[in-house]
Protein backbone atom coordinates (compact mmCIF):
# COMPACT_ATOMS: atom_id res chain seq x y z
CA UNK A 1 0.00 0.00 0.00
CA UNK A 2 1.52 3.32 -1.01
CA UNK A 3 1.49 6.57 1.00
CA UNK A 4 -1.41 8.10 -0.94
CA UNK A 5 -3.58 5.06 -0.26
CA UNK A 6 -2.72 5.21 3.45
CA UNK A 7 -3.55 8.92 3.58
CA UNK A 8 -6.87 8.36 1.80
CA UNK A 9 -7.76 5.63 4.30
CA UNK A 10 -6.95 7.88 7.25
CA UNK A 11 -9.24 10.57 5.88
CA UNK A 12 -11.92 8.08 4.73
CA UNK A 13 -11.58 9.21 1.13
CA UNK A 14 -12.64 6.71 -1.51
CA UNK A 15 -10.12 5.75 -4.13
CA UNK A 16 -11.17 6.93 -7.61
CA UNK A 17 -12.43 4.13 -9.88
CA UNK A 18 -9.46 3.77 -12.24
CA UNK A 19 -6.75 3.54 -9.54
CA UNK A 20 -8.98 1.17 -7.56
CA UNK A 21 -9.50 -0.99 -10.65
CA UNK A 22 -5.74 -1.17 -11.17
CA UNK A 23 -5.17 -1.90 -7.49
CA UNK A 24 -7.58 -4.85 -7.55
CA UNK A 25 -5.98 -6.31 -10.69
CA UNK A 26 -2.53 -5.85 -9.13
CA UNK A 27 -3.70 -7.61 -5.95
CA UNK A 28 -4.96 -10.49 -8.11
CA UNK A 29 -1.57 -10.70 -9.82
CA UNK A 30 0.36 -10.92 -6.54
CA UNK A 31 -2.01 -12.84 -4.26
CA UNK A 32 -4.00 -15.32 -6.38
CA UNK A 33 -3.11 -18.41 -8.36
CA UNK A 34 -3.38 -18.46 -12.15
CA UNK A 35 -6.91 -19.89 -12.34
CA UNK A 36 -8.28 -17.71 -9.55
CA UNK A 37 -6.62 -14.68 -11.11
CA UNK A 38 -8.16 -15.35 -14.52
CA UNK A 39 -11.63 -15.75 -13.04
CA UNK A 40 -11.19 -12.74 -10.73
CA UNK A 41 -9.84 -10.47 -13.46
CA UNK A 42 -12.73 -11.35 -15.74
CA UNK A 43 -15.25 -10.61 -12.99
CA UNK A 44 -13.60 -7.32 -11.96
CA UNK A 45 -13.47 -6.09 -15.55
CA UNK A 46 -17.12 -6.96 -16.11
CA UNK A 47 -18.26 -5.29 -12.87
CA UNK A 48 -16.33 -2.08 -13.48
CA UNK A 49 -17.59 -2.01 -17.07
CA UNK A 50 -21.19 -2.41 -15.84
CA UNK A 51 -20.78 0.43 -13.38
CA UNK A 52 -19.00 2.80 -15.74
CA UNK A 53 -22.01 5.06 -16.33
CA UNK A 54 -23.62 4.93 -12.88
CA UNK A 55 -24.57 8.40 -11.67
CA UNK A 56 -26.23 7.63 -8.33
CA UNK A 57 -23.72 8.81 -5.68
CA UNK A 58 -24.92 6.33 -3.06
CA UNK A 59 -24.52 3.45 -5.48
CA UNK A 60 -21.02 4.63 -6.40
CA UNK A 61 -19.94 4.94 -2.77
CA UNK A 62 -21.20 1.43 -2.03
CA UNK A 63 -19.55 0.00 -5.13
CA UNK A 64 -16.17 1.64 -4.54
CA UNK A 65 -16.08 0.94 -0.81
CA UNK A 66 -16.90 -2.74 -1.40
CA UNK A 67 -14.06 -3.08 -3.89
CA UNK A 68 -11.68 -1.26 -1.51
CA UNK A 69 -12.52 -3.74 1.25
CA UNK A 70 -11.94 -6.58 -1.21
CA UNK A 71 -8.54 -5.17 -2.25
CA UNK A 72 -7.58 -4.68 1.41
CA UNK A 73 -8.51 -8.28 2.20
CA UNK A 74 -6.43 -9.58 -0.71
CA UNK A 75 -3.41 -7.44 0.13
CA UNK A 76 -3.51 -8.39 3.81
CA UNK A 77 -4.28 -12.00 2.92
CA UNK A 78 -6.91 -11.97 5.67
CA UNK A 79 -9.30 -13.82 3.37
CA UNK A 80 -7.23 -16.99 3.74
CA UNK A 81 -8.01 -17.28 7.46
CA UNK A 82 -11.74 -16.56 7.21
CA UNK A 83 -14.15 -19.40 7.76
CA UNK A 84 -17.47 -19.36 5.99
CA UNK A 85 -19.65 -21.33 8.37
CA UNK A 86 -22.29 -18.66 8.86
CA UNK A 87 -25.58 -20.52 9.24
CA UNK A 88 -27.58 -17.30 8.95
CA UNK A 89 -26.14 -16.75 5.49
CA UNK A 90 -26.95 -20.31 4.45
CA UNK A 91 -30.52 -19.99 5.74
CA UNK A 92 -31.02 -16.79 3.74
CA UNK A 93 -30.21 -18.52 0.43
CA UNK A 94 -33.01 -19.75 -1.80
CA UNK A 95 -33.11 -23.28 -3.24
CA UNK A 96 -31.47 -22.27 -6.52
CA UNK A 97 -28.58 -20.53 -4.73
CA UNK A 98 -28.05 -23.55 -2.47
CA UNK A 99 -27.94 -25.77 -5.57
CA UNK A 100 -25.38 -23.48 -7.19
CA UNK A 101 -23.30 -23.48 -4.01
CA UNK A 102 -23.41 -27.28 -3.91
CA UNK A 103 -22.34 -27.55 -7.57
CA UNK A 104 -19.49 -25.11 -6.97
CA UNK A 105 -18.35 -27.07 -3.92
CA UNK A 106 -18.46 -30.33 -5.90
CA UNK A 107 -16.46 -28.81 -8.76
CA UNK A 108 -13.81 -27.49 -6.36
CA UNK A 109 -13.49 -30.88 -4.67
CA UNK A 110 -13.08 -32.60 -8.04
CA UNK A 111 -10.48 -30.04 -9.07
CA UNK A 112 -8.49 -30.66 -5.87
CA UNK A 113 -8.59 -34.42 -6.47
CA UNK A 114 -7.25 -34.02 -10.02
CA UNK A 115 -4.29 -31.88 -8.91
Swiss-Prot record:
Keyword Chaperone on entry: yes
Pfam families: Complex1_LYR_2
InterPro entries: SDHAF3/Sdh7 (IPR008381)
UniProt entry keywords in alphabetical sequence: Chaperone, Mitochondrion, Transit peptide
Keyword Transit peptide: yes
GO cellular component: mitochondrial intermembrane space; mitochondrial matrix; mitochondrion
The organism's place on the tree of life at top rank: Eukaryota
Xref: CDD domains: Complex1_LYR_SDHAF3_LYRM10
Locations listed in the record: Mitochondrion matrix
Swiss-Prot/TrEMBL GO biological process terms: mitochondrial respiratory chain complex II assembly; succinate metabolic process
Role this protein plays: Plays an essential role in the assembly of succinate dehydrogenase (SDH), an enzyme complex (also referred to as respiratory complex II) that is a component of both the tricarboxylic acid (TCA) cycle and the mitochondrial electron transport chain, and which couples the oxidation of succinate to fumarate with the reduction of ubiquinone (coenzyme Q) to ubiquinol. Promotes maturation of the iron-sulfur protein subunit sdh2 of the SDH catalytic dimer, protecting it from the deleterious effects of oxidants. May act together with SDHAF1.
UniProt record similarity statement: Belongs to the complex I LYR family. SDHAF3 subfamily.
Subunit architecture: Interacts with sdh2 within an sdh1-sdh2 subcomplex.
Protein name: Succinate dehydrogenase assembly factor 3, mitochondrial
Lineage summary: Eukaryota, Fungi, Dikarya, Ascomycota, Taphrinomycotina
Amino acid sequence: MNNITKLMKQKNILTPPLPLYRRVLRAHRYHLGAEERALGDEYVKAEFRRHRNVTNPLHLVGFLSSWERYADALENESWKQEKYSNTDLLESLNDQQIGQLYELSKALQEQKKSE
